[in-house]
Amino acid sequence: MAKLDFNMLQSIYQEDLKYASRWDIAAIDQLPEYMKQCFLTLYNAINEIASEALTNHGVDVMQYLKKGWVDLCKSYLVESNWYHNGYKPTMQEYMNNAWISVAGPIMLVHSYVFVSSQITKEELERLTTHADTIPWSSTIMRLANDILKPLDEQNIGEFQNQFNVI
């Protein structure tokens, strides 16, 4: 019965993610109440950041910020699916998702937009296509996070890290 409940919730979450990833404010009516405030806050914050970047740098960063957040939410959904289905991913499966779920790529995009004196589409493309060192630096972040994760998080049912995948 619990598995059936989770599968129903999973399909609802996937539907919610579909609406949220369209980045359409009109889609907010399709979201459940608990997600409306979260989506509105994220939507407004990202629009404000993109507007400021366009005004100050002449570059539209919206698509890059949106992609980062959609990728992050999808990776969280993968981890949720593993957890609720009792699936123990292989180390490769875990790491293929974990370097995104640690939020490294989205932090790098936001850092670049906030700190860079000259924003270029080429650099944004490089950051959001996860080329070069992005996966590696995010993997280091994930490993450090998993190594330093306090035991109390593991005791409250926190999702597995690579050490209990092995």
Listing of model-derived features with the role each one plays in the protein:
Residues M1-I166:
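Alpha-helical, largely C-terminal catalytic domains
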